[in-house]
Amino acid sequence: MSVLLFGVSHRSAPVSVLEQLSTDESDQAKIIAEVLRSSLVTEAMVLSTCNRVEIYAVVEAFHGGLSVIGQVLSDHSGMSLQDLTKYAYVRYAEAAVEHLFAVASGLDSAVVGEQQVLGQVRRAYASAESNHTVGRTLHELSQRALAVGKRVHSETGIDRAGASVVSVALDVAEKKVGPLAGRSAVVVGAGSMGALAATQLARAGIERIHVVNRSLPRGKRLAENIRGYGIAAEAYPFDHLPPLLTDADIVVSCTGAVRPVVSLADVHRGLAHVREPKDLVICDLGMPRDVDAAVAGLPGVFVIDMDRILREPTAKTATSDADAARSIVATEVANYLAGQRVAEVTPTVTALRQRAADVVEAELLRLDNRLPGLDSSHRDEVANTVRRVVDKLLHAPTVRVKQLASAPGGDSYAEALRELFELDQHAVDAVAGSELGAVSGDELAAPAIDLDLTE
């Protein structure tokens, strides 16, 4: 078994396609449940953000697992399998590990170096764990990816240039209406993105923030946090949105809803009471879109959506920081894979030692039968001597096979041990199933590919 990644992101598809593939927690649970119905898939989790949808799965066979995942995503999105594969990328085994480490480090983000994706990876894993859809392989992979992401951000300067999507949107807004200091804002959505938007607005010197959220208590908690920055803030339910737009200079919407929450009628009603003509900037960070597409056609309204953000020149990361981050990822990938290969040979080594112990015990029993009058102290000395001899004979080859197994292709040494000592594969598998350190994963050198589900 090995890890298979099937994904679509801002690098491979336009926003319209990402919208079709966008998922909420309920969708993700259904997708994973459908994927796991196949005997070819044993573990799975979904990483879904505003600019990517990726399924990580442990599969019994590459092509079979790929077909299962592709068909499930095709059914979910309403896209034909043929159309979906035009925008999909596939990574397998080592390439899948490298990709997740790069994603967690912010190297694959729309804005390189942003830290928000690290939290998104953490939530994807936590959700899968709570639904019991990850086992040992994805557990260890996810935990290592999170550790790698933290290391990259702590040891390099990549996050200094890695502004969030919110920061890029606000930069575009300032180009349109000038500095945000002293202005009034509306934040639609009080989740993690809404909180990030409020923080960025506070840093920009905004004077007042109105929070609009379906759950008023959650909106009030965010408003209270905003007031901690010394900024006036109140929370409102959704039906208060139109009048709040009347005095607003900028709106940031990021609810994660499956359909638009800011309608053309809402904006019409809000602007109808504006005393003096002014520009209203609406940053639509939802995926799918939070704002009705028709709103962009209103005079004086400037909509910044994900399409626009992804076309913007992103914050430039210093070459040295990016190179340092990639170097860390490469080192961590190599260490992780070496550890997995050693973990795979460990059950064979354990089975060999158990086989040797069984032989020793059988011979001691034979000794007891042949020399029933043997003094117990002499018998113990013989037993200890035999065990020491066996341990010394096995020490060098078992240590060496673990060292050799850490290199690519090292599984051949475990196979040689099994062959030379006639170790039953069922016995090895039984040991593997009982050891917490064992990992399922046949790290085959399969290529990273960017489509082909149709062969």
From Swiss-Prot:
Active-site residues are: 50 (nucleophile)
Top-rank taxon, per record: Bacteria
Subunit details: Homodimer.
Q: One MF term from GO for this chain? A: glutamyl-tRNA reductase activity
- The residues the record assigns to binding substrate are 49-52, 109, 114-116, 120
Q: Which residues bind NADP(+)?
A: 189-194
Q: Give the EC number(s) listed in the UniProt record.
A: 1.2.1.70
Q: What is this protein called?
A: Glutamyl-tRNA reductase
Alphabetical list of NCBIfam families matching this protein: hemA, PRK00045.1-3
Record GO biological process: protoporphyrinogen IX biosynthetic process from glutamate
Point out the annotated site residues (description: Important for activity): 99
What keywords does the record list, in alphabetical order? NADP, Oxidoreductase, Porphyrin biosynthesis
Reproduce the miscellaneous comment text: During catalysis, the active site Cys acts as a nucleophile attacking the alpha-carbonyl group of tRNA-bound glutamate with the formation of a thioester intermediate between enzyme and glutamate, and the concomitant release of tRNA(Glu). The thioester intermediate is finally reduced by direct hydride transfer from NADPH, to form the product GSA.
The domain-related comment in the record is:
Possesses an unusual extended V-shaped dimeric structure with each monomer consisting of three distinct domains arranged along a curved 'spinal' alpha-helix. The N-terminal catalytic domain specifically recognizes the glutamate moiety of the substrate. The second domain is the NADPH-binding domain, and the third C-terminal domain is responsible for dimerization.
Q: Which CDD domains match?
A: NAD_bind_Glutamyl_tRNA_reduct (cd05213)
The record ties this protein, via PANTHER family, to: GLUTAMYL-TRNA REDUCTASE
Species, as recorded? Mycolicibacterium gilvum (strain PYR-GCK) (Mycobacterium gilvum (strain PYR-GCK))
